[in-house]
Curated annotation (Swiss-Prot):
Keywords: Disulfide bond, Glycoprotein, Secreted, Signal. Its main location: secreted. The lineage of its organism: Eukaryota, Metazoa, Chordata, Craniata, Vertebrata. Disulfide bonds join C30-C60, C33-C41, C48-C84, C87-C104, C105-C111. It is found in: Secreted. Belongs to the PATE family. Residues 28-114 form the UPAR/Ly6 domain. It comes from Mus musculus. Pfam families: UPAR_LY6. Strongly expressed in the epididymis, including the initial segment, caput, corpus and cauda regions. Weakly expressed in prostate. Residues 1-20 form the signal peptide. One of its GO terms (cellular component) is extracellular region. Glycans are attached at N57. This is Prostate and testis expressed protein 13.
Length: 137
């Protein structure tokens, strides 16, 4: 009996969304990378998932790290972390010269792609997205 129940739960969770099937997404998929340099993931891009049921837990998180440049007086982008942790947006001064900025997104799957960085040019991001679309086809 338990095996049939478990099988039915997995069928519902992994069911393909089509026009004949009335489903809603129970899972949120996010990118997972511990060192994203603004262009690519240094240690390999992975994915993670979480249940998309509770409003406070359905976000994908991007943590941008900035270091303070003494010569210019500006915080410059260093790297980003992409993950599935519960998110609290905002800025946090980690050390005297390291700042962490956290972005949360809930609009779609894999929405934490590292493009929420203000130091990256929008022209470069559009070019990266076009290359990605061409490679996906």
């Amino acid at each position: 009996m338990f095996q049939k129940l478990l099988l039915s739960v997995f069928i519902i969770l992994l069911m393909d969304v089509g026009e004949r099937v009335l489903t809603f997404n129970l899972l949120r998929h996010c990118n997972l990378c511990s060192h994203y340099d603004g262009f690519k993931c240094r240690n390999g891009m992975k994915s993670c998932w979480k249940f998309d049921l509770w409003t406070q837990n359905r976000t994908c998180t991007t943590e941008n790290y900035y270091y303070y440049d003494r010569f210019t007086g500006l915080y410059l982008f260093r790297y980003a972390k992409l993950n599935c942790k519960p998110c609290a947006p905002g800025m946090y001064q980690m050390f005297h010269d390291l700042l962490r900025e956290t972005f949360c997104c809930i609009d779609r799957n894999y929405c934490n792609d590292g493009t929420a960085n203000l130091d990256t040019s929008s022209i470069l991001i559009e070019d990266m997205n076009q290359k990605k679309e061409l490679n996906d086809d």
